[in-house]
Amino acid sequence: MIAVGIDPGKSGGLVKIHSRNNECSMHKCPGTTHEMASILRAAKNSSFVDSLPIMVAIEKVHAFPTDARSAAFKFGMNYGMWLGVIGALSIPFIEVAPQTWMKSYAPLPKIKQERKKEIKKIATEIFSEIYSN
């Protein structure tokens, strides 16, 4: 399987894991739908060439009432662009709430900035080989 995980936030990104050769690649969140499509198209092409299924898991996000309107709009636009590209390429996907995947790493700090730092630290430890390259 080729598994793709997407954090659609402004400072988010994408990770692609190829199960057959354990190849893992990471990308910062692209700024355009063209760049998004290019990354996902390459993943889909790999799945075709290697006769492997592909699945995308995208973080199911929403704006909070305390978010600035322009930031919330941009956040929603980015999420929608990802969904549009995934749909246009006919890639199967699931939406995963942050609380669902964060349970695996509990307990995490309550304060958002501290929580993000801790999650980044965990990811760095898990994917240390990739981060060092």
Positions of PLM-derived features:
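Phosphate- and other anionic-substrate recognition elements at nucleic-acid/protein interfaces
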Residues: 1-133
